[in-house]
Amino acid sequence: MSDEEQTAIVCDNGSGMVKSGFSGDDAPRHLFPSIVGPPKNEQAMMGSAKQEMFVGDEAQAKRGVLALKYPIEHGIVTNWDDMEKVWHHTFYNELRVNPESHNVLLTEAPMNPKQNREKMTQIMFETFGVPAMYVGIQAVLSLYSSGRTTGIVLDAGDGVTHTVPIYEGYSLPHAIRRVDMAGRDLTEYLMKILMETGMTFTTSAQKEIVRNIKEQLCYVALDFDEEMTNSAKSVSEEPFELPDGNVMQVGNQRFRCPQALFKPALIGLDEAPGFHEMTFQSINKCDIDVRRDLYGNIVLSGGTTMFKNLPERLGKEISNLAPSSIKPKVVAPPERKYSVWIGGSILSSLTTFQSMWITKSEYDESGPSIVHSKCF
């Protein structure tokens, strides 16, 4: 591939946000919510606003009159027509490029169904006419972005959480843990426990308000029971201004919400392991010789790891589970909200990577299943 070839596009399609930009950049250029919305009823939209479907920020802004839908649930694309609209919006409206002249690197959650990545591959070549593409596993890209090739990544986004042990650049699939509990579940849990304040949040528009409350006010308690006791003794509330100008007070919900990450039973997932247990279980499924290296490189990734105190609490909980001779080290890169994208940008700009792209001619020869032999 000559140097004159157009820069590759890197697109990290999360359940909650699309992060897109160009290979070699140090941050994504465009971020928008992974949502599409047709109007709830045709009459509600007048004149120039009358279009079939809104995507991303525009859908967010008009959420009152739209029926918002997420095409990606728990990291898996559930509606391909809507997903195509999201990609079209990414290429033509956000990045303002013609995908026919750019290689495209996409990301996916580990343990995704095989047909999911085949369908992605097919759409890229057949609908968008890309010259070449690649599908990278999100957690592996995050580890690259932290400058490591060995470690265990705890990646928690909006739709899915997984712990992925990686040794010298290769993920260890037998030891991956995946739980369908992440940011969106916390938002729903917060909606539920905020009802105690007398407020009700039911519409998709109100759900976005609760997501903002979660991101701005919630934090992880280092010691949950102690925090509960203290909050019962003295009322500690934080104000939050609602879009209509009213102010609501948020109390112990601020730390009760993220507690579900360590105790999923709070949100009805009785069998699911918490963040600390997932990490511990993944490490224990690995060869005994690599465990110490993994304990020493527990790398956080994704927006749901951004809560205040989460790295400290995770380290404390894993210490309680691990052998006494082990001192776990939790690494929380400040840019971890975008580390999957950053890893994709780094990987796709390496000269050694250029032979890894799936080209159009390889696709024509082998069909969508080529993705399993070239992307692993």
From Swiss-Prot:
Family annotation (PROSITE patterns): ACTINS_1, ACTINS_2, ACTINS_ACT_LIKE
Gene Ontology terms for molecular function: ATP binding; hydrolase activity
GO CC terms in record: ciliary plasm; cytoplasm; cytoskeleton
Alphabetized UniProt keyword annotations: ATP-binding, Cytoplasm, Cytoskeleton, Hydrolase, Nucleotide-binding
Compartment(s) of residence: Cytoplasm, Cytoskeleton
Domain of life of the organism encoding this protein: Eukaryota
Any Pfam family hit: Actin
Annotated catalysed reactions: ATP + H2O = ADP + phosphate + H(+)
EC number in record: 3.6.4.-
Coiled-coil region(s): none
Predominant subcellular localization, coarse grouping: cytoplasm
PANTHER family per the UniProt record, alphabetical: ACTIN (PTHR11937)
Function: Actins are highly conserved proteins that are involved in various types of cell motility and are ubiquitously expressed in all eukaryotic cells.
Family: Belongs to the actin family.
Protein name, UniProt field: Actin B
Organism of origin: Trypanosoma brucei brucei
